[in-house]
Amino acid sequence: MGQTLFAPNATKSGTMIKLHKHDLPDGLDLGSVVAVDTETMGLNPHRDRLCLVQLSAGDGNAHCVQIIPETLGGRGADCPNLKRLLANPDQVKLFHFARFDVAILRQALGVEVAPVRCTKVAAKLVRTFTERHGLKDLLRELVGVDISKQQQSSDWGAPELTPEQLAYAASDVLYLHALWARLEGLLIREGRLELAEACFRFLPARGQLDLMGYEDPDIFAH
């Protein structure tokens, strides 16, 4: 059974955040485009463990799957429903900075996430007049939503996550559908949608290259 939380002050009024231990429940339908994000102990996928996977169908609700290692009484990578969704070729996974997320999900769960879209890549392709491509900036400027980043560096490996942590985690997926709609319009306007789609198809391979140590120096650098 999942734990249901309401966090109107941290996200938006009426938002439902559902916390699931270990895996998504059977029969959950999140639609054809699913916003996804991850929380980890750090930014090194070889060292830092995956702690939380957040998902949203774009309906104002968020589902958070807490990944608990077997050494701490959990099930580790035994999350068949989550992995089935991540690998489902008929469900698009929508990320912000997919490069990191697809790498950590491959490393932690052994799953290749596809197909994917990335709002950060899309923003960099069309918002060439600015360096503001972070999620907070994009949501404020394109969607009119101001999210808090106060819990960004908190302890995501804690056995019990606080309502504030879950509200922060949920905010990273609740508005991605709306953001993508704006960015897709800009990609079409600037004639760069096909280029963006080519970049998105490459992202799983980019994540695998990073895991193999090709991120520094970058294999595409001179």
Model-derived segments and spans:
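DEDD superfamily 3′-5′ metal-dependent exonuclease/proofreading module
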Residues: 1-222
